Amino acid sequence: MQSNSTGYKLIKIGSIVLILYVLIGGLFLPLKTGITGVSNGQLKSNEPQSFSVDLYNPGSGFVAEKVILKHKNLVFQSQENQYNEVGYLNSKINVVLGDTQHSQLFDVFVFGSSSVSPKQWMYFPDAVWVEKSISDTGVSNKIELSNLTSLVKQDVQSGFPNRPILNESIRNLLYHVPMWFSMMFLLLLSVIYAIKYLMKNQLKDDLWSESFIKIAILNGILGCVTGSSWASITWESWWPSDDPKLNGVAIGMFMYLAYLILRTSLKDPYQRARISSVYAILIYPIFMALIAIMPKLSADTLHPGSGGTVGFNKYDLDNTLRLFFYPAVIGWILFFTWISILRYRFETIKNIQIEREDNE
């Protein structure tokens, strides 16, 4: 990898353009309408009752067209909806489960229109518990599921998806996740150059490997900072100690910090390069197993996409967010690759100066 090549310039320019695009869009694109909570969410079947939905960013002049409770194929629609400008939607509904159903926990869907969008929808999972009453017998008053599906497809509101618990913090997806992609990419490059050193015995390859690892550690620190701030909002804990992915990250970070300590303890440059290269090659698959494989085998992780937890690609990553998420991943990878190249150049110049001073 030549630092003065056309590829270097493309990496530098590409990273700046993509990150600026992500920063501007990620900060200023509004969030879609969402639900932040549901009050009076315990109902009895076959009895007209009301519950309240707390809406976020619905837009002025919002009108609730439909409020729906859904559990698998059971779908019920409210009979009356009243919205006030404070952000609360009061819905009256009479759920008749019928003689073939039991008490169930329902998701809430709200469909409406406002000055923001003529068609918009939002939902909140596991929001309303319907207790089956003794008088609930006979035929259920559920509606067809196809009605709900067609309404969801009519959503034309622009903006980032507004998901329960995440809300505005979903923007952190453009920073937190790319940090770990960047770290894994740089660590892979460090392994490649470690192998090159063992094959060719050239110190420049060891310097490349060291540069990639040091910037990857910076990625890990930034990933922990952005992740902890996110966790404090969504999980109400800066570092949930029982999450296997977080524990795997902590172990992996200490493994690479040990790499730096190992290098400082070895004075001979060729011995340092040889031992460090072997160490870098050995710990990379262990690190990947700790952060990518072990969490998927655990049932207790809080991170999306692991241990049965729904992943962003199935739950939150809609088309609007994809337009920024994928450029964010590429942009941050290019940016930290550029920083790694700059560090390599700095260390190369410093080594040349040291050699000149020794010769004098």
Language-model features: locations:
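Polytopic transmembrane helical bundles with strong interfacial aromatic enrichment
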Residues: 2-41, 82-86, 122-360
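Immunoglobulin-like IPT/TIG beta-sandwich domains and homologous Ig-like subdomains
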Residues: 45-114
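Extracytoplasmic/lumenal ectodomains and periplasmic regions of secretory and membrane proteins
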Residues: 98-140
